[in-house]
Amino acid sequence: MSKLSFRARALDASKPLPVFRCEDLPDLHEYASINRAVPQMPTGMEKEEESEHHLQRAISAQQVYGEKRDNMVIPVPEAESNIAYYESIYPGEFKMPKQLIHIQPFSLDAEQPDYDLDSEDEVFVNKLKKKMDICPLQFEEMIDRLEKGSGQQPVSLQEAKLLLKEDDELIREVYEYWIKKRKNCRGPSLIPSVKQEKRDGSSTNDPYVAFRRRTEKMQTRKNRKNDEASYEKMLKLRRDLSRAVTILEMIKRREKSKRELLHLTLEIMEKRYNLGDYNGEIMSEVMAQRQPMKPTYAIPIIPITNSSQFKHQEAMDVKEFKVNKQDKADLIRPKRKYEKKPKVLPSSAAATPQQTSPAALPVFNAKDLNQYDFPSSDEEPLSQVLSGSSEAEEDNDPDGPFAFRRKAGCQYYAPHLDQTGNWPWTSPKDGGLGDVRYRYCLTTLTVPQRCIGFARRRVGRGGRVLLDRAHSDYDSVFHHLDLEMLSSPQHSPVNQFANTSETNTSDKSFSKDLSQILVNIKSCRWRHFRPRTPSLHDSDNDELSCRKLYRSINRTGTAQPGTQTCSTSTQSKSSSGSAHFAFTAEQYQQHQQQLALMQKQQLAQIQQQQANSNSSTNTSQNLASNQQKSGFRLNIQGLERTLQGFVSKTLDSASAQFAASALVTSEQLMGFKMKDDVVLGIGVNGVLPASGVYKGLHLSSTTPTALVHTSPSTAGSALLQPSNITQTSSSHSALSHQVTAANSATTQVLIGNNIRLTVPSSVATVNSIAPINARHIPRTLSAVPSSALKLAAAANCQVSKVPSSSSVDSVPRENHESEKPALNNIADNTVAMEVT
């Protein structure tokens, strides 16, 4: 203490402190005389502040040690007492509460708003409380968000609705009050701010900065891993807590909406009671006039009942929505253990319409929500229904990973076991289409020989023919059918089958069913298909083999009286061998040569007829008739032997196209005439033209009015009969009573390969042309394309012209050559033919 001057040193904890006894201490007045030579430090204040009254008093009081304690002054601001204002704020009677304010030590402090409510705001909040539910803290939070969300320019009302998660009416009231108060405020913001240090370093020496940033220090050690783990745990905890807060907020909004709905329902019931609307008529009228509102979520509703996973359309009018917990859980937790599906009840119980229970209301996908997933309290029973199949069930399923599983968002209907059908091949009475293309036929295989039941053919990959089999109740009967009996003729089928059934089984009912099936098959009530291979006959080298167009059931019929029959020349073989032929290269070449020779002879005959037409009418008619008869009969004699064993058929679609392509026009025949050498193998569409009726030839008659005459008896349809070509007199016996002596000459031409048409040049002949056109079976013509029939009619179905006393230009027709209409029906000059 002897040194009068010393400098301030930092305290050293290791240095021992001196110990003084009481008698060694100097007196108090001696301390004042000690001059402590401490350098004067700058105060950091301005000169005006240093001379401030309170500051100078505090400095002087600190320097005065010898004065008494009463003279020492602590500088405090001067206070004014207002007792009336104090008593208005604090009540006079104070009672000690039973429990003081208790704060948990480790609780999270809620973030308090920076805006403080003033007196003007308190008046506004008390006034707004009467209309809406609001508290002072909620008002402070709303103003704080509006202030922090807007900078120099205040936010708009739409932006305020995005910032504030409140009702629109409350947001509008608070926003208008805030805008009004902000305009009256002179400062930039309603929240007072403390001056802080600027980041650019310009306020380093500013003494009015209240809070300064800490000096950045170099970090000498790394962060530990446990700090990162703790931080991640805190983030997870914050997320979980925020999710809980969001759930509570949503529950609060839901309960508030329920309360408003209850008030509205009560109000509606009171209005209906006052109006006397006890039966709901007024209510239904109002609902009909109301415009339909679009749903909030345009997602399909999935109705699910507790008793079944299926639902019908009767219970689809449900108007409430719920959140699908399953979809949100799948997004957050990709791996979850699926619960086992509840067992599906039988379809009989599922097919009955059931009322929707409150716990089975439809659900919707809530992926559009920006909040966390929030399950409803009454949605737990649906979790089992919506959950997928378990892993054990996948292992037990025979389909494995390809097993059928219900997909969320899809609606499934219960199957109807009482309706077995809806297939295209079933009859319309069973709910099908009855389409012929999908029909099944009784099918027999050759290797091994057995009947496989009902099947249908279709072409697979590579042109392979596949058989689709169909199950029926008679499959056990079909497998026991005798193949030899199916191919045998239809005489005493029951007796033949009785012997077979005795060897197979002794059941009488089985025998009866099988015999009835055999009768149906042989009577063509059931279609039977059996694959066959064509056989080659080389017994006669001079005969020409011919190829059948289609193997189908032979149909025979009789022509009705009053119609003229167009017959084919066929001969039946005496041998019992099969009637299947195939072409060889030599036979095909001989056949082409004969056809070309026939065409050349027909050209010569036509030119001879035209040359002799200028002479007398009767002589030309007889001469042309005799020449045609002799010429055609001579040429057909070589073809009669090739047609043995064939049965005539009516014209179908493929036969009509083949016949149309095999016939030629008059222009083509005239082109053949101009050539000196006949070129073999020339035809239309790759097929050699056969002999036929030529275009440009006309009929003549003595009575023009007879052209449109048609007998009613000839309207019926008839099948064409095969007959010998030499029996021409018998084929025209039905028309012989109509031909007069003057016009008895007939014209015979060959249509196709082996079809002969005999046309008398008389009035009766003209009368019989229309029945020829209408004589086809309607079922056969319906399957023929109109284009093929038009082509055959326009090119080849006109007969030769024979002059007479009164000539007519043409056969009754619609002048198809001039108008060229759409080929959508059968022409009047189409002649029915038979193709074998």
Curated annotation (Swiss-Prot):
Residues 346-360 have a biased composition (Low complexity). There is a cross-link at K319, K673 (Glycyl lysine isopeptide (Lys-Gly) (interchain with G-Cter in SUMO2)). The modification Phosphoserine is found at S539. Keywords: Activator, Chromatin regulator, Cytoplasm, Differentiation, Growth regulation, Isopeptide bond, Nucleus, Phosphoprotein, Spermatogenesis, Transcription, Transcription regulation, Ubl conjugation. The keyword Transcription regulation applies. The keyword Transcription applies. It is found in: Nucleus; Cytoplasm. Coiled coil: none annotated. InterPro entries: Enhancer_polycomb, Enhancer_polycomb-like_N, Enhancer_polycomb_C. Residues 811-820 have a biased composition (Basic and acidic residues). One of its GO terms (biological process) is negative regulation of transcription by RNA polymerase II. GO terms for molecular function: chromatin-protein adaptor activity; enzyme-substrate adaptor activity. Residues 335-360, 372-401, 802-829 are annotated as: Disordered. It comes from the Eukaryota. Pfam families: E_Pc_C (PF06752), EPL1 (PF10513). One of its GO terms (cellular component) is NuA4 histone acetyltransferase complex. PANTHER family: ENHANCER OF POLYCOMB. Component of the NuA4 histone acetyltransferase (HAT) complex, a multiprotein complex involved in transcriptional activation of select genes principally by acetylation of nucleosomal histones H4 and H2A. The NuA4 complex plays a direct role in repair of DNA double-strand breaks (DSBs) by promoting homologous recombination (HR). The NuA4 complex is also required for spermatid development by promoting acetylation of histones: histone acetylation is required for histone replacement during the transition from round to elongating spermatids. Component of the NuA4 histone acetyltransferase complex which contains the catalytic subunit KAT5/TIP60 and the subunits EP400, TRRAP/PAF400, BRD8/SMAP, EPC1, DMAP1/DNMAP1, RUVBL1/TIP49, RUVBL2, ING3, actin, ACTL6A/BAF53A, MORF4L1/MRG15, MORF4L2/MRGX, MRGBP, YEATS4/GAS41, VPS72/YL1 and MEAF6. KAT5/TIP60, EPC1, and ING3 together constitute a minimal HAT complex termed Piccolo NuA4. Component of a NuA4-related complex which contains EP400, TRRAP/PAF400, SRCAP, BRD8/SMAP, EPC1, DMAP1/DNMAP1, RUVBL1/TIP49, RUVBL2, actin, ACTL6A/BAF53A, VPS72 and YEATS4/GAS41. Interacts with TRIM27. Belongs to the enhancer of polycomb family. This is Enhancer of polycomb homolog 1. The lineage of its organism: Eukaryota, Metazoa, Chordata, Craniata, Vertebrata. The gene is EPC1.
